[in-house]
Structure formats: C-alpha cells, structure tokens
C-alpha cells in the first residue's frame, strides 16, 4: 500500500498546483492540468476497475473541489436514458477522490450510506460536483487524528449536459486514520 499512498500523495500535489482553467493556448499549464487529471483517472482505474469500464471520469479536481462525469454511452437503461446504477457510480466515487486528495493518503474514506433523489431522466452524460471547505477538512483531520475516525456528509447535485438538475445525492462517509492507536 505504501506505493499507492505515495502515488496518491504525489498526484494530489501535482494536481493541486495546476490551473483548472488552463487552455491549450497556455500549453505548459494545459499539459500539467490534463496530465494530472489523467493520473487521477488512472489511479481510480487501478483501484476500482469498475469505474472506467462504466464510463466514469474525474473532470476537475483541486483543493476542496471535485467534478466528475459518467457517460451515457454504455449506461443506458431500457428507456434509453441513464441507468440508475450509473448515477450512483458518479455520485459515490468523487467523495473518495475528494477525501483522498484533500486529507491525504493517511486517511481512508469509507461510504456508509448514500441516497439519491431522481428528479428527471438524463438523456446525456451526467456530471456532479462536490466541495469541502477548509474548515470542514481540518475538522475531519482533527477528529480522525484524535479518535481514529471521523464522519462527514457530502451533498451533490447531478446535472445533464444541458445543465438540467437530474438528481441529488446525499452521502455519509467515515474516514479512518491509517495506523491509529488509541492512547
């Protein structure tokens, strides 16, 4: 696990120092951004092979923020809209990504519970954004450092390609501090 922890840590530093708004007109900044996101998606694919197989990708990650996408292609239900399981996929994995990159590899995120409220069918790819403010990240670290674990929740708004709000997710996570020993 030390190798993957080092890889997560290095990727987190690389991505957090890139400019999420970099365009091709700024080739070095754009290359840093896109290679960082490619590394994040590769780590996810190595850790959770189900994710890339089912069209999941991280589109943007920076301190306190993650945006992810799931493709409609290969994930259609019997009505031709996005399959319910794909909504869960795109709503669940970003919480782990956000936690790993904001807290660091010394903390392991675990999903405890998640609910989805479906508002309307999505007939395109679906995106979700999550954020954690600095104070919340710090509170999670302090509690996990003191007790070995901490709980937090994330709410996500899922949008289709046209910007329609198609679902809302609420996820309850627990973070465990690796190697914690109670005093």
Named regions from a protein language model:
Residues 36-45, 50-51, 137-139:
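Short Pro/Gly-enriched beta-strand edge/turn motifs at strand-loop
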Residues 2-32, 122-123, 133-183:
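HotDog/MaoC-like acyl-thioester-processing domains
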Residues 98-135:
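Hydrophobic beta-strand-centered segment that forms part of the acyl-chain substrate-binding groove
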Residues 53-81:
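Catalytic strand-loop segment that frames the active site of acyl-thioester-processing enzymes
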Residues 73-106:
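A short mixed-secondary-structure module that forms the rim of ligand-binding clefts
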Residues 68, 112-114, 128, 152-154, ...:
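Hydrophobic residues positioned within well-ordered beta-strands of beta-sheet architectures
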Residues 52-58, 112-118, 139-141:
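Short structured motifs
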């Amino acid at each position: 696990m030390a190798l993957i922890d080092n890889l997560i840590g290095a990727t987190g530093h690389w991505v957090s120092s890139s400019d999420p708004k970099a365009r091709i007109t700024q080739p070095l900044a754009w290359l840093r951004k896109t290679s960082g996101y490619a590394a994040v998606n590769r780590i996810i694919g190595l850790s959770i092979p189900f994710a890339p197989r089912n069209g999941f990708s991280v589109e943007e990650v920076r301190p306190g923020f993650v945006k992810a996408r799931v493709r409609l292609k290969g994930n259609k239900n019997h009505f031709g809209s996005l399959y319910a399981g794909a909504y869960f996929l795109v709503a669940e994995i970003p919480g782990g990504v956000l936690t790993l990159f904001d807290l660091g590899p010394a903390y392991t995120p675990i999903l405890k519970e998640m609910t989805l409220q479906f508002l309307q069918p999505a007939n395109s790819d679906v995106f979700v954004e999550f954020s954690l403010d600095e104070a919340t990240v710090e509170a999670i670290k302090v509690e996990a450092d003191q007790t070995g674990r901490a709980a937090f929740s994330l709410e996500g708004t899922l949008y289709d390609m046209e910007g329609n709000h198609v679902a809302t997710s609420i996820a309850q996570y627990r973070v465990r501090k690796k190697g914690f020993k109670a005093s």
